[in-house]
């Protein structure tokens, strides 16, 4: 159950109900059998002048808040590392703006360092995920052009 947008939805006024009674979305989901969450992480989901891109603004702060709330309710979670600043899917796989001009060798190092940094921060917070998804919907590769689908050697380097 991907809950990455819940904080933004709540901030915009969304309310969640169970049989007509307002409640916490995670508690309602738990009541009906949900036991694991999917939380996405975008590298830097903000414009150059600091405005959020929206769609959940899935940054590290939101990840920690959702993982903490889920942990309190007994959820496990999958961390989805997009390696992008916004949506990555089969039709577009843009590297984070900070990595935009990197070559494949640099991208390999950036992915490794970023992944390690995120996981070490989560470990210090006692919020390590049960599963990690490297990339999002990477059918056609990731971090184009260096990781486009026809460059399988680079894709393997980036995700191993």
Segments (PLM) and residue ranges:
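Conserved, mostly hydrophobic/aromatic
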Residues: 1, 29, 80, 132
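Boundary/entry segment of secreted carbohydrate-active catalytic domains
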Residues: 1-28
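Active-site beta-loop-alpha junctions enriched in small/polar residues
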Residues: 3-6, 42-44, 82-86, 134-139
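A short acidic, helix-capping loop that chelates divalent metal ions and anchors anionic groups
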Residues: 9-11, 47-49, 141-143
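Catalytic domains of carbohydrate-active enzymes, especially glycoside hydrolases
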Residues: 19-44, 78
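Acidic (Asp/Glu)-rich catalytic clusters
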Residues: 24-33, 61, 65-76, 120-128
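Glycine-rich, proline-tolerant flexible connector loops at the mouths of alpha/beta enzymes
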Residues: 39-57
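Active-site cleft segment of glycoside hydrolase catalytic domains centered on the general acid/base Glu
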Residues: 52-53, 58-64, 88-160
């Amino acid at each position: 159950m991907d809950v990455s947008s819940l904080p933004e939805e709540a901030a915009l006024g969304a309310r969640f109900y169970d049989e007509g009674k307002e409640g916490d979305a995670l508690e309602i989901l738990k009541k009906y059998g949900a036991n694991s969450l999917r939380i996405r992480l975008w590298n830097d989901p903000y414009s150059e002048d600091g405005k959020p891109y929206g769609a959940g603004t899935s940054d590290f702060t939101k990840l920690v808040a959702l993982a903490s709330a889920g942990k309190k309710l007994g959820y496990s979670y999958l961390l989805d590392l997009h390696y992008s600043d916004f949506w990555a899917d089969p039709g577009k796989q843009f590297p984070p703006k900070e990595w935009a001009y990197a070559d494949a060798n640099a991208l390999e190092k950036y992915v490794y360092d970023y992944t390690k940094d995120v996981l070490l921060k989560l470990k210090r917070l006692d919020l390590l995920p049960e599963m990690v998804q490297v990339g999002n919907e990477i059918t056609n590769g990731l971090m184009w052009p260096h990781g486009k689908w026809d460059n399988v050697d680079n894709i393997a380097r980036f995700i191993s």
